[in-house]
Structure formats: C-alpha cells, structure tokens
C-alpha cells in the first residue's frame, strides 16, 4: 500500500502547472432512513451526510413513492436537507412504488446511466454518473456469490471504454477475504479501510461496504484519508468517507463561469 501511495504522489508531483483540490467520496446504505431505534428520520440521515461534507454519495436501500414511506420520494427528501442533487435508480417494484439505489451530488453530472444487474433474491442495479473529471458508480450487490461475480463482469465490460478516473462504491455484501473481493481487487484498488467494519452499525463486526478505484485509470489522485463514520443509530450500516487529493489544471480550478 505504501508503494501505491508513493507512486501516486509522484504522479501528482510531476505536474507542477496543475493545482490540487480535494474530492470527498461517500457511500451509505441508509436502510430507507429507518434507524436502529425503529424511527424513520430523513433529517438524521441528512445530518450524517452534512457532517461528512461529501461531494458525492452512493446511496443504497432507498424507497420512492412506496406506501411504507408515505408515498414520498425519500432520496429527494434527503437531497433537500443536504442541498444536493438526487438521482434515483429503481431495482424493483415495491409496496406501491419502487426500491433501489441512488446518488446525491453537489455537481450536476454530465451523464447518467442505470444498468440492471443479476440478483436471484431480488433484482439489482448500478448507477453510473459521469462528471467532468471523474466517474462515480453506485451499486448494491446480490447476497449470492454467483450473482456478484456476474455483476462484476458486467461492470468491467461497461467501464472498459472510459478514460477518466472511475470509482465504484456501495454495499457489496461480501467481506474482504471473500472470493468476490479478491476478484474485484484484480481490476480495482480498494480505497476504503478494510480493517474498519461497517455492519451492523451499533457494533460493527463485518466489512461489506466499499469505495474502490478502477486500476485502468488510477492516476492523478492520492488518498488523504479513509474512514468509517462513527454513526451507530441512523441506519444498520455505517457510512464510509474517502478523501482524495487530485491534480487539476489551473484553468479549470480558477474558471469564473
């Protein structure tokens, strides 16, 4: 890991005409804002996000217009409380509405794409958001290893043509020592801290949530910090926050329009 950080630092160093800025990536399985105290609170989830101050958040387990959520657009409720843009990708029809994943972003994406993924217990999906300088993907993978492996092949095929730094975030339903994570690491560098558990939130004993970077374009950034946010109550998962230092051309950093 030290060698990787040193290499990335060198890559940043050899661009003296570029400025540097930070990018804060987050992933959070919010359990539809239902906390461990059985209280549904959009504001509590929003507070967790606001305190972390991310640029983009991968959200898992979120309803849209379901009866159990009072026919509310849950992601929109949280977006309103965080002053972020909301993008929802349904995975299944559920309880009079839809259930799936989403993104919260400070910056409006240039392009969005939702891709169905296999899941024998329930359908899964991936949402890809392309920004000017990077790509952020959110997913919530199947409980079944075979489905996760098939999903990974779909993801790898999808991202092969992209040249920008690309990040994959979400609830992978697999622990670091699993065959799936070992396979994932062939093509992705995991940026989040594998030694810090994310589930269950009150007393985490498993690491099943991740933020990773595609190795094919893993240049121009360095990890400043990677942590699991200490939030035991708002959901059954704890969120992950990764902060990156990235190299950017000065004319983009200091643009006035």
Regions of interest found by a model, annotated:
Residues 19-26, 106-110, 122-138, 244-250:
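Beta-strand-turn-beta hairpins that frame and shape the catalytic cleft
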Residues 1-22:
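Bacterial Sec-dependent N-terminal signal peptides
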Residues 114-115, 145-149, 157-167, 173-257:
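Metal-dependent phosphoester-hydrolase catalytic domains
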Residues 17-81, 93-97, 153, 245-257:
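N-terminal, active-site-proximal structural segment of metallo-dependent hydrolase catalytic domains
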Residues 28-31, 60-62, 89-92, 105-107, ...:
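Active-site-proximal beta-strand/loop segments in catalytic clefts of secreted hydrolases
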Residues 23-30, 45-69, 136-139, 155-181, ...:
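Active-site beta-strand/loop signature of hydrolases that rely on acidic residues for catalysis
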Residues 50-54, 79-83, 87, 109, ...:
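Sec-exported extracytoplasmic/periplasmic mature domains
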Residues 37-38, 62-134, 220, 224-230:
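Structured beta-strand-rich core segments of catalytic domains in phosphoester-bond hydrolases
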